[in-house]
Amino acid sequence: MKPSTICRKWLNSLPPTQGCLKKEQSIGRELLLEKGMPSHKDEAWRLCNFNRLNSFLSLPTICNSDDIKSELIFPEIDENSARIIIKPNENNVLNINLPNGIEHMSESELDDNLGTIVNSTNVKNDISVGLNQASSYELLALKVKCNFNKSLEIVIPSIKEKLISTRVFLLVEEGAKLDLLQVFLGNINSAQNHLIEIKLESKVDLSHGLISLGEEKGSSSICTLAVEQSEKSKYSLHSLHHGWDYARFEPRIIQTKGEASTIIKNLQVTKSKEQIATHSLIRFDGPNGKLDQLQKAVASEYSHCIFNGSIEVPQKAQKTQAAQLSRNLILSKRARIDAKPELE
């Protein structure tokens, strides 16, 4: 079956546009109808395993509460941490109990912010985002106040033989300091599609851990992370991807006025016939910005790791200090690692 046919069949299987993301759903579906799925001619997807990507769309998106993997056991939460577990079709995000210092964003705040960060990255034919927009029905939109003094965990488990789409927006207020941990858990023959937008106001210090663990047999994940940094903010991302049959991670960080610090430390580990790809974009829209990026990959057996790291430093971003390093370890003759740094 042709990719365009698979895409149309998937779009036709989706429920009607509805809820707070109705407008976003229409945008995503129109993009996919116009552009279709990517091909080897698209540079950003050139190395993609398209059989895996097409199977991503073969799973149904509608699930019942009985589908939820209820036997998951999580470590006991630390007294200085707050944990949110997102279970599609089981817990309405508006009814989640929030700790002191975190509140739901208002409707006007959402109107002003939702989608602006990911749109500002200016990615042409943004298929990853379009897939999420088309199929996300709930939005976890939180404002972190400067008086919040705990760590925050957001855990998203998969559902066997289902495709789930989640959307998260975090607005971190001026002067706040936050330790954030996100955990994505795969399941057999399952798929996840995540879109995360984070807006850091001035003088925010955010340490962001992202652990993405698949379950090998038919588990896949596409995750887009879009971060907007205001001046004098600090953002540190440490991520791990392991165990996915197919995974694609797209971190995009924009320093809107420069004068900010970004640290990225990513590790992806593959075995068997897995393919895990990281496509990062960091752009400086002002002077005196700093970046320290380290990408590590370990590939064994017949697996494939991909890294494409784009750094955009326009003329207005004077005195930018940007460092990017890629370190790779191949453990078998059949394994493959492709790394491509880009400075524009």
Predicted feature descriptions by range:
Residues M1-T166, E173-G175, F184, I330-E344:
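N-terminal leader/transition segments
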Residues D112-E344:
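Conserved beta-strand/loop scaffold segments within soluble protein domains that form the structured core
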